[in-house]
Regions:
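Subset of outer-membrane beta-barrel
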Residues: 19-438
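Bacterial Sec-dependent N-terminal signal peptides
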Residues: 1-23, 118
Length: 438
C-alpha cells in the first residue's frame, strides 16, 4: 500500500511541476486559469465543493470539515484529472488533451474537537499553443503559454459546540503560493525557410504570496431520518505578496557559431494582484426506509446539494469575475457499510453521484469576453473495505460546453474524467498512533 502511494505521489508531483498543465487559450490572461477547486467526489456532484463532507473524506475546500474526521483515522487524498477539449473559432477546430493534478493532502485528528490537514494543490495554470498568419506584415506568429502556480497549505478545523441535534464548526487554511507563468511570442517572415524565429518576446510573472481560507459549517439534525448542513467559505485578498513581471524582446543574429539572440529590451517591474473568493452551500440528507432484499436489509440514503461560488481577480490591465451555481445528488444504497459488509453485494456498496453546474466567466482585458460554461456530471464512489479501513476510489465524468455570447468567439466542448484516491490505514495499523513499550 505505501509503495503504491509513493508511485501516485511521484506521478502527482511530476505533473505539478510540469511546464504546461492546461490547454486553454483563455489562460493567457492574468496569472492563468483558476477554478473553485477540483476533486473526483465534488466534480461528480456538479462541482459542489464547499458543502459535502463526512468522516471518510478530506475536504480541503472547506477547512471547517476537518473537525468531522473520525478519531484515530488518518486520511491521505490524491487526485488526477484529464480533459479532452475541442476548441472552435470561426472555421478552425483544434483538439487538445490535458492531464492535471488535483491535490495531495493529508488529514488527521488532533483531538475529539480538532482536526488538521496539510498538502499541495494547484493555484493557477497556463498553457496554450496558437499560430497566427499575419498576411499584412507577412509574419508567422506563434503564441505559447506555460507554467503554473501552486499552493502549499496547512490548516485546522475546530468544533465550536456539539449538542444533541446541532453542530457548529470553524476552520482555516494558511496558504503559501509560489510559481511562475509565461507568455511567449515567436515571429518569423513568410519567406524565411529556416524554422528559427527571427524575434522572440516573452512576459513572465513570478508570484510568491501568503493568503488564508476561512470555512464554517452548521449541521442541524431535524429528525431521525432528516438533517441539513449550511456551509460557507471565504478567501480574502492576498495577505502578503511579491509579484514580479519580467518582459523581454530579443532578435536573432546569425553567426558562424549559429543563431544568437540579442536583447533589444528587458525590463522587470513589481506589480500586485487582488484575488478573493466566496462560497455558500447547503446539503440535505434523507435516510430512506430500509429495504428487504433476499432476506437481507439495506439502509439507503439520498443527499441533495446546492451551492453558489464567486471569484474576483484584478491584475494589471485585466480583471476576471467567475460566478457558479452547482447542484448534485448522491444515492447510497447502504449507509451502514462496516456493520453489513459481509452481506452486501458490490453494487450495494457504491455511492452513485450526478450533478449539474453553470459558470459565468467575465474577462475584462483588451475587450470584454463573457463565457457561459454548462456541464453535466456523474460518478461513483467505491469503498475499499479492508479490515475497516476508510479507503475509497472515486471517479467522476463530465460533459460540458463553454461558449461566448459572440458566436464568432472561441468556444469549447469538452469531456472530463477525474480519479481520486482516499487512503486510510487499517484499524490495526494506525499511521500516527502512540505506542507503549513494556
Amino acid at each position: 500500500m505505501r509503495s503504491f502511494i509513493s508511485i501516485l505521489f511521484s506521478i502527482f508531483f511530476s505533473n505539478l511541476i510540469a511546464q504546461s498543465i492546461t490547454q486553454n487559450p483563455l489562460s493567457y490572461f492574468g496569472i492563468g486559469e483558476q477554478n473553485f477547486g477540483s476533486n473526483a467526489i465534488y466534480d461528480a456532484l456538479g462541482r459542489n465543493s464547499v458543502n459535502y463532507y463526512d468522516s471518510s473524506q478530506l475536504n480541503i475546500f472547506n477547512p471547517a470539515s476537518y473537525s468531522s474526521m473520525s478519531s484515530g483515522n488518518t486520511l491521505l487524498t490524491i487526485g488526477l484529472n484529464g480533459r479532452l477539449s475541442k476548441f472552435s473559432e470561426l472555421n478552425n477546430d483544434a483538439l487538445r488533451i490535458t492531464i492535471m493534478p488535483d491535490q495531495f493532502a493529508l488529514g488527521f485528528k488532533l483531538s475529539k474537537q480538532i482536526g488538521a490537514a496539510f498538502g499541495l494543490k494547484p493555484y493557477s495554470r497556463r498553457g496554450y499553443d496558437i499560430t497566427e498568419y499575419d498576411s499584412i506584415n507577412l509574419l508567422i506568429n506563434k503564441y505559447e503559454g506555460s507554467g503554473g502556480t501552486q499552493a502549499f497549505f496547512l490548516g485546522a478545523g475546530f468544533r465550536i459546540f456539539k449538542l444533541n441535534t446541532s453542530n457548529l464548526s470553524f476552520g482555516f487554511n494558511a496558504n503559501y503560493i509560489f510559481g511562475s507563468v509565461t507568455n511567449t511570442r515567436n515571429s518569423k517572415l513568410f519567406s524565411t525557410i529556416n524554422s528559427t524565429p527571427a524575434g522572440i518576446s516573452n512576459s513572465t510573472i513570478k508570484l510568491n504570496a501568503i493568503n488564508i481560507d476561512l470555512g464554517i459549517s452548521f449541521e442541524q439534525i431535524i429528525s431521525k431520518n432528516h438533517s441539513v448542513i449550511l456551509t460557507g467559505a471565504f478567501t480574502p485578498n492576498l495577505l502578503s505578496q511579491n509579484l514580479k513581471i519580467s518582459e523581454g524582446l530579443f532578435y536573432a543574429n546569425s553567426s558562424s557559431a549559429g543563431v544568437i539572440y540579442d536583447t533589444i529590451n528587458y525590463n522587470v517591474v513589481s506589480s500586485s494582484i487582488n484575488n478573493s473568493a466566496l462560497k455558500f452551500g447547503l446539503s440535505y440528507r434523507i435516510n430512506l426506509k430500509s429495504w428487504q432484499r433476499n432476506m437481507r436489509f439495506i439502509n439507503p440514503s439520498i443527499l441533495f446539494l446546492g451551492s453558489y461560488s464567486t471569484m474576483k481577480t484584478n491584475f494589471s490591465t485585466s480583471s476576471n469575475e467567475m460566478n457558479q451555481i452547482s447542484f448534485g445528488i448522491q444515492f447510497a444504497p447502504e449507509t451502514k457499510i462496516f456493520e453489513n459488509n459481509i452481506n452486501l453485494k458490490l453494487l450495494e456498496k457504491i455511492n452513485y453521484r450526478i450533478g449539474f453546474y453553470k459558470q459565468q466567466n467575465s474577462i475584462n482585458a483588451i475587450s470584454n469576453l463573457n463565457y457561459n460554461d454548462l456541464g453535466f456530471t456523474f460518478g461513483l464512489g467505491i469503498p475499499i473495505i479492508i479490515q475497516q479501513s476508510l479507503s475509497s476510489f472515486n471517479a467522476s465524468f463530465s460533459f460540458g460546453n463553454c461558449n461566448a455570447k459572440n458566436s464568432s468567439s472561441l468556444s469549447e466542448k469538452y469531456f472530463g474524467i477525474n480519479f481520486g484516491f482516499v487512503f486510510s490505514p487499517a484499524k490495526f495499523d494506525r499511521w500516527f498512533r502512540k505506542r507503549k513499550l513494556d
